[in-house]
Amino acid sequence: MNNSTRLISLFSPHPPPLFLLRGLYISRIANLRRFHRRAFPPSSVASTNLCSFRPLVSLPPLIPTFPIGRFYNHQVRVSAADFVPSYHNQQLPEWTELLQSLSKAGYFSDSGSISGLESEFFPGFPDELLRPALACLALARERPELLEMLSRRDVEVLVENGKPFLFKTGPDSLKRMSLYLRSGLQGIGKLMDMEKASTVDLMRLILSYVVDVASSEESKQHNKEIMESSVRSLLSQIAKMSLRPPESNVHDTMQNQYSDRDGQGVRSFQNNVEMKRGDWICSRCSGMNFARNVKCFQCDEARPKRQLTGSEWECPQCDFYNYGRNVACLRCDCKRPRDSSLNSANSDYSSDPELERRLVENEKKAQRWLSKVAQGGSDANSVDTDEDFPEIMPLRKGVNRYVVSTRKPPLERRLANTENRVATDGNSKRSDDNALGSKTTRSLNEILGSSSSLTSRSDDKNVSSRRFESSQGINTDFVPFVPLPSDMFAKKPKEETQIGLIDNIQVDGFSGGNQNVYQEDKSDANHSGKETDRLEKEDHKSEEPARWFKRVTELHNVSDLESAIPQEISPEKMPMRKGENRFVVSRKKDRSLTSPAYKRPEDSDFVPFVPFPPDYFAKEKQPKESIDTLPAPATENVSQVVQQEPREPSINKSDTVAVKIRNGKSLEGSLVKESDLLDMSEEAKAERWFKRVAEIKNISELSEIPDEDFPSIMPMRKGVNRFVVSKRKTPLERRLTSQRHQRNPHITNSDPTGKGDK
């Protein structure tokens, strides 16, 4: 049949030129736009500038597929099964992909699915676009669930910027889509069937945008890039979903699962789909999600809250379902929120009628209690009875939430009642005496000027003592709690004053007032005497440093200050003077039993350390030796005078060392012992080292000291840095130095003044 078709096309007359078809296509699109602008307001028009158009698809492949008999003298009948679209669009490659997917799914070959849809378009719709548009609308009618499965963000961009100008019911579709986006998830179930948006409404917007982009060279929209990316994303998603089998039954059942008004219980939406415990259905796209999903995997909708029953609670961190007895989450160890515990408690006790009755009674008691307290003062115990006192303390504005009841327990209230009865009986018998005594004490207090605070304290103590006496009379085993006085652990003057006050309280009449005054005078005298003694001691201590400084200035030239200054004048703590060091060590002798002098035995071999004399190492007092030197020529300048090195024969070197040792300053009369040459201790080495260093005149003589006498640790001397680095050469260096010295002996001047012999 293909061969016959080719032969017929060869013998048939040629079709009209391409520009004629393009002109016809452009004229029809322009007529549709003009009709759309006249029928609807200008705001619903997608694009007003239609100066130039471009064909949506390549026209030659569409020529043999549509009824275009008006362009041919002979009609060619091509079956629908042989139709294979080959559309190419450079701007929207996803549109070509969608048409190929529809062709594979059989929407172009099924004429029954697209029949009756031609009436949706405006009259004069191009025949070249009719069949692809009908195939897209057929897909939208068969797959109504695609609207919920597409990206909501892309749909919002298309609805805000797109205009369905190709269809008669375009404004209605745009209205339904806008209402769908505004209503959200909660308003979908409340809308009527006529107001609900469908996939067909979305497809009308997509087709109008595709035709608009293909027919205009340059789009005048300000958000062209956002609009194009959203439409391409929607076309790609629809092309992929069109190849999948339809799931209309699943969609219908999932739409009905939330038909209950309260939303309790989940019905089985499909018999062949098994849902496990914890799985949930998305209320937006009706997609089934696993229990671990926090949001829907299709539309990114948040997981709905569970309908909790009883004391169960949901973890706020990991959304894990916990029982009421769980204090912490079993999955993430998160602590149970406080709101859930309150809700569970309210749900448990809300059905108890007895509890409700008691709460109502407590509220009434609380109102009566508050009114009585406001009228009777702050003493609630005397105002209220047990019947009027509320079980739960009411909360008032500005009061702490957790109020602790100050109400006494029943036992204490009974004891207080018996005390009051005993007190009233005693007061009736002694009313006259008490009245007379109170008048006398008031008059004395006014005369003597005693403070009212002491009287109030005495009254409180008398009342407490009466209560304790009455309680002891009722119960012999009762031991009252007597608090300690506030000044019990204070100083003695205060204790004596308190004793005087207590004696004054116990004695009635004028004699008690006189005794109180006497005790106060006595305590004041004792306090003033002790204060005087303390001031004298402080003055004596402050005078000691002054006397010590005066004595030191008088004995400024005395070398031994410790023996010259008596012990009584020397203070225990050295005073501080301006400009001196803060940490001053006292010169006072330590005569305690723990001193080192006391611990040292008398028959020990202790040898005290005696420092060298200050002029022991002075070179000026050393005996001068005659050294032969060559005088410099007198005609030369002073700057050109070069002192010749002294010439000393190497044979007399040992004799010179012996003379130095014999002529050295004697230490006779000091406590320094003669060192033992066989002693290899560090102290002996240090002692021998100091002796030899004092005798050395030339640095080259250090090599003559044997290694045994050289100390491993350099000794410390006064005025020398603590961290002394040894300048001793290694044995190899000493050998090299000695050979070099033998070849070319180096003689230096040992005279410290540099004047030489005169």
From Swiss-Prot:
* Annotated stretches, region: Disordered: 410-470, 512-545, 572-606, 629-654, 727-758
For region 3 X approximate repeat, the annotated ranges are 122-502
Q: Where in the cell is it found?
A: Plastid, Chloroplast
How does gene deletion manifest?
Defects result in variegated plants that have leaves consisting of normal green and also white or yellow sectors in which chloroplast development is retarded or disrupted. Mutant plants exhibit severe editing defects in chloroplastic transcripts.
Q: Which UniProt keywords apply?
A: Chloroplast, Metal-binding, mRNA processing, Plastid, Repeat, Transit peptide, Zinc, Zinc-finger
In this chain the sequence repeats are located at: 368-415, 547-596, 688-736
A GO BP term, please?
chloroplast organization
State where the RanBP2-type zinc fingers lie.
276-305, 308-338
The Basic and acidic residues compositionally biased stretches are 457-469, 519-545, 572-581
Single GO cellular component term: chloroplast stroma
Question: Where does the entry say this protein is expressed, by tissue?
Answer: Weakly expressed in leaves and roots.
Concerning PROSITE patterns, the annotation shows: ZF_RANBP2_1 (PS01358), ZF_RANBP2_2 (PS50199)
* A molecular function (GO) term: mRNA binding
Quaternary arrangement and interactors, per the entry? Interacts in vitro with the chloroplast-located protein CCD4/NCED4. Homodimer. Interacts with ORRM1. Interacts with PCMP-H51/CRR28 and PCMP-H12/OTP82. Interacts with ORRM6.
By its UniProt entry, which PANTHER family does this protein fall under? ZINC FINGER PROTEIN (PTHR23111), ZINC FINGER PROTEIN VAR3, CHLOROPLASTIC (PTHR23111:SF30)
What's this protein's function? Probable component of some protein complex required for chloroplast and palisade cell development. Involved in C-to-U editing of chloroplastic RNA. Controls a large number of chloroplastic editing sites. Binds the editing recognition trans-factors PCMP-H51/CRR28 and PCMP-H12/OTP82.
Protein name, please? Zinc finger protein VAR3, chloroplastic
Give the species this sequence originates from. Answer: Arabidopsis thaliana (Mouse-ear cress)
Q: Gene behind this chain?
A: VAR3
